[in-house]
């Protein structure tokens, strides 16, 4: 168990993928999980689930919930400096294709520049492992969301490819059943209509 007694930071902790990562990682009993999300309600729900699991399993993991935006580079740098995570899961992103298409500037700010802020903060604080959660839409992107995620992958690769003291991974998910960006609820809605 390479996560036991480690400090792990998860961006997008209130999202469907981020929340599930938090749950699974808690079962590995890290020393600390630092949750970052810009949605108060989503962060609250994730924290509630983790607190319940922590009590029911008598885990000693320290859970820190931070209502923060990845779009503020100073905030990210300060957060990483203060909590000194060893492992980072970067799951924060705007992912609803139709909304990203109609709000490309905000999506680029969040998915590209926000990712850059997280990557730079991680390198500044000497993170040992960085996992970027991406999408299958980053392969030959045909929409803004796919392009922003592909750019975040390229940025990560360019910043860490020549570093020997950090392990990095990019995980591309397809359509995740049960996630808030899944096409399944849309299909169900259309069938009911």
Question: Where in the sequence are the language-model features?
Answer:
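Conserved NAD(P)H cofactor-binding loop of Rossmann-fold oxidoreductase domains
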Residues: 67, 91-95, 134-136
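NAD(P)-cofactor binding segment of oxidoreductase domains
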Residues: 32-39, 81-82, 87, 102-130
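NAD(P)-dependent short-chain dehydrogenase/reductase
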Residues: 51, 120-123, 144-193
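N-terminal Rossmann/SDR dinucleotide-binding element
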Residues: 1-86
């Amino acid at each position: 168990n390479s996560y036991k007694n480690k400090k792990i930071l998860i961006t997008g902790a209130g999202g469907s993928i981020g929340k599930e990562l938090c749950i699974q990682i808690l079962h590995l009993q890290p020393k600390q999980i630092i949750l970052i999300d810009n949605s108060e309600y989503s962060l609250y729900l994730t924290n509630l689930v983790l607190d319940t699991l922590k009590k029911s399993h008598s885990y000693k993991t320290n859970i820190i919930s931070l209502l923060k935006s990845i779009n503020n580079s100073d905030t990210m740098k300060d957060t990483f400096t203060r909590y000194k995570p060893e492992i980072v899961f970067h799951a924060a992103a705007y992912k609803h294709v139709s909304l990203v298409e109609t709000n490309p500037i905000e999506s680029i700010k969040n998915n590209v520049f926000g990712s850059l802020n997280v990557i730079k903060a991680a390198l500044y604080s000497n993170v040992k492992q960085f996992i970027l959660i991406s999408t299958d839409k980053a392969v030959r992107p045909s929409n803004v969301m796919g392009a922003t995620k592909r750019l975040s992958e390229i940025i990560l690769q360019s910043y860490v490819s020549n570093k020997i003291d950090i392990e990095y991974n990019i995980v591309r998910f397809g359509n995740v059943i049960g996630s808030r960006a899944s096409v399944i609820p849309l299909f169900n809605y259309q069938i009911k209509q």
